[in-house]
């Protein structure tokens, strides 16, 4: 499958490949079809195979990026063909039967530096996106399938907002003041000119263009969606929906679809429809707002005063209707072909509110060698309706002598904005034996520019003024009504190459890792005539994923029956029953060769009063005492932290377990201004946006669990290991300054200490765990600690050491369900050192002494061993942590509580 034009958002349900084979079908072993559903530019994919069908959905981290994945198992040439055919890009393996699966994927997208010609724009880091994706696909009641997905993208870095002649940039940090220039100079051909000592006139033509870029604080997008499918013998129907939310854009979507099989299931027809409704609410960058004319957007623009500052907001609504029709045909035992057409109609606010267009007004004066004009910035204006058509084609062919398959894709895209795009892609899927598969690929993409795109717009007329003596443009006198300088609507081509490596581990677990490198160039446009080379850049994308077949044969699980002495059989490593969800390293795998995969989620919240010691304090106390020698101007209103962690455990012996625990975090802090404080020069201004966000890869845990003692009903083991500093501790935010004279400015500085993604230090995290069980009761205790092995991290500080102790007991309510109660004591030291770079000191959260303390908590939990057929061996556990007492260092926001959920399965 190809990719749409960069910057083109296609909200469409796009089915592709589905085929279900009858037992009498001689091509059954290789027939295959996939449905692909695209929600707002993110790809959700489904795979079906002959004896059974499995759905696996995936979200790409960005338009134009896709990491292929595959899993194959060689049995015979026909079985190999089937497996090879199933290795479609981005999709998990379909296994025998009708399996339920769990998938977790991490992806990273990173752009290279752009050519900014030594302007101060070059100081900005390029775009980086960290993405996580989770999917659970469950089969139930024989013919039903449920698929749920969660996607999270965290963005940071600088992106172009417009294009301007280099000579208009004035070497400013963002280029914004280019639009404040009352006079710019062009020659008789209306080309920009530069000063020169080598020409008699002192001016020299210079047509070089350059991107204006701007950087923003970290932002996170979260999306959840679901699908429910019912299957008949020769048909299927699906309904689904979801929500995508970020700080300035929220979308809801629903879809319906179906498929019909004909010709002994050698032919499949797919069809579907979707509807998306979106709300846009953007606060314009205060660095650009004073220079940008928003008058062309009328009622979409609202100006308000927040915290004493002017805030310009752009709001709008968008609607997308989509329909599609697809056909899959099995040609012979070695090949199948797929083709589909899709249509999307988008209406409403289709602009990107962050994109600016340069208007150059020059009044012609015949006979003059040089002319002066005005260069003004306006918000882009796109058509209110967009009609889009897509035609996708794919050929899958099994190459029997090499036990491999080739996938060839072509996509044609066209819309009524004047963009036509072509995508060619070629994948080679090669099994290597022992569960290994390698998939190299190459992709070429080309599009022409939109009808209303130009790097900037030249008008051979005097600047039309709405009111004499004021700079506002009279847009009724501008000869065009639609215009954009968004480089994603320009003419360009991309060429990419990549590789995916997949490994099947037993019958239940598959691992994949992929990498793809892209080059984006105007010169690669089909037929030439693309954007000039100032817009060229490279980027890369990589991901890694783990997929677990939930219906595979797993280890026997802990029995909770009183008829089983101490509840012990093969899974004896769980002596003492299952600990609450929040207890790490609570058990060991019992036998050499055992393997466990788990997922853990934690959400913790802080809001309410500001505490000092054990009591709450007033705002007046915070102002006078919370920020050292200066007065505080802000205090935290709320902080939310989400953590996603994988638990991967392997037992090389019956007394030693090895554990890998990668984690991914995101945090959000909302601030409130303190009463009576001056928010003028040099203070921290949010311009209406008082929320900071961070997120990405956290620290990675590596541990060894060692069994010390075990008898029936009692078990003791210790954990030795710790975390590697893979989490970023250089997360920054943009501080806006509003001096009384001059334009708004910004400073990029370290975000509040508690919002960094990791510790930045190598941390030793030992623990000692005891568990026991008698009858329906089980109990346990754990001592654990964190010792920072580095005195400072790369940002100049180190979090305090930590000691924790916990005791719990649980009772079996049923043979499959237990309830637990837990007490937790934690002591954490304050931060050592401080940031060694720019950082705010506007509130208590910015001072190292306001971290750490002593905490008492109560945990209430439920743990279940799933009793349903097809899900045996799966454990689900939940625990709520309720704070009982806080004795904090410095001034800290009150803790509200934490929710912990975990899932695990062993085989």
Please tell me what each predicted stretch does.
Residues 115, 151-211, 215-224, 268-334, ...:
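Outer-membrane beta-barrel translocator/channel fold
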Residues 106-112, 152-156, 232-234, 241-247, ...:
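Transmembrane beta-strands of outer-membrane beta-barrel pores
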Residues 97, 111-115, 120-229, 564-728, ...:
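Transmembrane beta-barrel domains of Gram-negative outer membranes and organellar outer membranes
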Residues 117-123, 210-214, 240-245, 255-259, ...:
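Extracellular loop and loop/strand-boundary signature of outer-membrane beta-barrel proteins
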Residues 114-120, 159-165, 241-244, 249-257, ...:
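Outer-membrane beta-barrel translocator domains and adjoining extracellular loop/strand segments
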Residues 194, 198-204, 340, 344-398, ...:
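Outer membrane beta-barrel transmembrane domains
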Residues 135-137, 225-227, 257-259, 322-326, ...:
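Outer-membrane beta-barrel architecture
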Residues 100, 144-146, 234-239, 265-269, ...:
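Repeated loop/turn-to-beta-strand initiation elements of outer-membrane beta-barrel proteins
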């Amino acid at each position: 499958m190809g990719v749409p034009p960069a910057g083109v958002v296609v909200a469409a349900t796009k089915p592709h490949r589905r085929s279900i084979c009858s037992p009498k079908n001689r091509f059954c072993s290789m027939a295959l079809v996939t449905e692909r559903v695209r929600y707002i530019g993110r790809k959700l994919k489904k795979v079906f195979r002959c004896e059974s069908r499995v759905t696996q959905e995936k979200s790409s981290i960005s338009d134009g990026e896709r990491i292929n994945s595959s899993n194959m198992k060689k049995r015979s040439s026909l079985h190999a063909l089937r497996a090879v055919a199933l290795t479609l890009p981005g999709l998990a393996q379909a296994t025998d039967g009708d399996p339920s699966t769990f998938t977790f994927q991490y992806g990273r997208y990173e752009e290279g530096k752009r050519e900014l010609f030594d302007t101060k724009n070059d100081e900005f880091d390029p775009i980086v996106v960290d993405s996580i994706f989770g999917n659970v696909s469950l089969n139930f009641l024989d013919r039903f399938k449920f698929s749920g997905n969660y996607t999270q993208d965290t963005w940071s870095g600088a992106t172009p907002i417009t294009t301007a002649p280099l000579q208009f940039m004035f070497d400013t940090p963002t280029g914004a003041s280019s639009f404040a220039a009352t006079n710019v100079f062009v020659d008789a051909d209306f080309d920009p000119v530069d000063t020169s000592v080598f020409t008699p006139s002192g001016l020299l033509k210079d047509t070089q263009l350059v991107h204006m870029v701007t950087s923003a604080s970290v932002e996170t997008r979260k999306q959840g969606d679901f699908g429910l499918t019912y299957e008949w013998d020769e048909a299927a129907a699906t309904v689904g929906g979801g929500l995508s939310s970020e700080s300035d854009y929220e979308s809801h979507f629903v879809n319906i679809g179906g498929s019909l099989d004909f010709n002994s299931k050698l032919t499949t027809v797919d069809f579907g429809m979707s509807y998306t409704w979106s709300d846009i609410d953007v606060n314009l960058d205060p660095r650009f707002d004073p220079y940008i004319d928003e008058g062309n957007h009328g009622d979409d623009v609202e100006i308000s005063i927040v915290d004493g500052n002017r805030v310009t907001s752009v709001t709008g609504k968008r609607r997308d209707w989509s329909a599609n029709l697809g056909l899959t045909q099995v040609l012979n035992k070695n090949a199948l072909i797929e083709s589909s057409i899709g249509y999307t109609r988008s209406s409403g606010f289709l602009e990107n509110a962050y994109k600016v267009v340069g208007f150059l007004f020059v009044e012609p004066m015949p006979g003059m060698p040089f002319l002066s004009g005005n260069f003004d910035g306006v918000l882009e204006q796109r058509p209110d309706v967009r009609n889009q058509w897509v035609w996708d084609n794919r050929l899958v062919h099994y190459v029997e002598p090499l036990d491999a398959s080739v996938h060839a894709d072509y996509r044609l895209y066209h819309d009524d904005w004047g963009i036509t795009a072509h995508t060619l892609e070629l994948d080679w899927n090669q099994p290597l034996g022992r569960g290994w598969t390698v998939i190299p690929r190459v992709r070429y993409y080309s599009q022409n520019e939109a009808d209303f795109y130009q790097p900037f717009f030249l008008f051979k007329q005097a600047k039309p003024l709405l009111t004499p003596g004021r700079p506002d443009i009279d847009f009724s006198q501008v000869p065009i009504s639609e215009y954009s300088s968004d480089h994603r609507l320009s003419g360009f081509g991309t060429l990419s190459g990549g590789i995916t490596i997949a490994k099947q581990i037993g019958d239940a677990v598959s691992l994949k890792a992929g990498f793809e490198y892209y080059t984006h160039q105007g010169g690669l446009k089909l037929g030439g005539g693309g954007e000039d080379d100032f817009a060229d850049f490279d980027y890369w994308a990589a991901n890694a994923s783990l997929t677990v077949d939930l219906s595979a044969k797993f280890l026997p699980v802990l029995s909770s029956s009183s008829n089983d002495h101490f509840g012990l059989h093969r899974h004896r490593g769980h002596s003492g029953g299952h600990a609450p969800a929040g207890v790490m390293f609570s058990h060991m795998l019992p036998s050499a060769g055992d393997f466990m995969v788990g997922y853990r989620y934690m959400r913790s919240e802080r809001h309410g009063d500001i505490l000092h010691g054990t009591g709450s304090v007033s705002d007046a106390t915070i102002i006078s005492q919370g920020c050292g020698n200066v007065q505080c101007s802000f205090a935290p209103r709320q902080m939310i932290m989400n953590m996603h962690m994988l638990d991967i455990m392997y037992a090389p012996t019956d007394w030693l377990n090895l554990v890998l625990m990668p984690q991914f975090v995101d945090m959000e802090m909302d601030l409130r201004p303190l009463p009576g404080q001056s928010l003028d020069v040099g203070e921290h201004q949010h311009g209406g946006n008082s929320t900071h966000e961070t997120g990405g890869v956290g620290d990675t845990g590596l541990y060894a669990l060692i069994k010390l003692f075990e008898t029936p009903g009692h078990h003791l083991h210790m954990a030795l290991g710790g975390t590697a500093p893979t989490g970023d501790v250089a997360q920054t935010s943009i501080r806006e300054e509003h001096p009384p004279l001059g334009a708004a400015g910004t400073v990029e500085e370290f975000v509040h200490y508690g919002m960094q993604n990791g510790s930045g230090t190598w941390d030793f995290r030992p623990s000692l765990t005891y568990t026991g069980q008698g009858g329906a009761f089980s109990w346990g205790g754990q001592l654990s600690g964190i010792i920072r092995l580095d005195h400072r991290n790369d940002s100049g500080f180190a979090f305090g050491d930590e000691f924790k102790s916990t005791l719990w007991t649980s009772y079996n309510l049923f043979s499959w369900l237990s309830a637990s109660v837990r007490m937790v004591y934690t002591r954490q030291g304050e931060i050592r050192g401080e940031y060694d770079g720019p950082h705010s000191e506007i509130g208590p959260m910015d001072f190292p002494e306001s971290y750490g303390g002593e905490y008492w908590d109560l945990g209430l939990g439920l743990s279940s061993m799933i009793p349903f057929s097809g899900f045996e061996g799966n454990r689900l556990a939940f625990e709520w942590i309720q704070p009982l007492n806080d004795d904090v260092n410095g001034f800290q926001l009150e803790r509200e509580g934490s929710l912990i959920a975990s899932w695990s399965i062993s085989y």
